Amino acid sequence: MSSCSNVCGSRQAQAAAEGGYQRYGVRSYLHQFYEDCTASIWEYEDDFQIQRSPNRWSSVFWKVGLISGTVFVILGLTVLAVGFLVPPKIEAFGEADFVVVDTHAVQFNSALDMYKLAGAVLFCIGGTSMAGCLLMSVFVKSYSKEEKFLQQKFKERIADIKAHTQPVTKAPGPGETKIPVTLSRVQNVQPLLAT
């Protein structure tokens, strides 16, 4: 299993090689004591990689779709209200022998009809979008059951791996009082005081 310093070190070496800059002078080695990895070790291990959940993205999709559908419905209702509540203008007036047709009134009334049509279309698009997104939210919850199953399977796999590995250090048994060879002799590394 690779450590974070190995992963980060390889990335830093690649970045230094690509950047082409060299450092001269006194170097601080604090970076070896503090990990600056933004990625987790588990993301680089093949044993611990799992597929990212499609649940998050589909959740975002249906929420954004529901909001946009609501906006379309409100916009459609507003445009429909304008189309129906604004009174149409009189297009033709006059006597039976002499009738005058107002072209601006004809254009205005056709614009009101277009408002009614556009409002109905926007309302239908928004309603369809809202219905589809609400159905999508139901199907997303069924994905979460599958995801829980995959998480449980992953936890079982991790438990199997932990069960088969031996612990690094064990507490000595009741009859074991041996000192390890490396710790049997303690060597002082501090300089002696000159008296």
Swiss-Prot record:
Where the protein is mainly located, per its record?
membrane
Source organism, top-level taxon: Eukaryota
Q: Which residues cross the membrane?
A: 66-86, 120-140
Protein topology in the membrane? Multi-pass membrane protein
Q: List localization entries.
A: Membrane; Cell projection, Neuron projection
> Matching InterPro entries, A to Z?
Neurensin
| One Pfam family it belongs to | Neurensin
Q: Which Gene Ontology BP terms does the record give? A: nervous system development
The entry's note on the tissues where this protein occurs is:
Expressed in brain. Not detectable in other tissues tested.
Which GO cellular component term is one of those annotated? neuron projection
Per UniProt, the keywords (alphabetical) are: Cell projection, Membrane, Transmembrane, Transmembrane helix
Q: Which family does it belong to?
A: Belongs to the VMP family.
Describe its function.
May play an important role in neural organelle transport, and in transduction of nerve signals or in nerve growth. May play a role in neurite extension. May play a role in memory consolidation.
| Protein name per the record | Neurensin-1
Species name? Homo sapiens (Human)
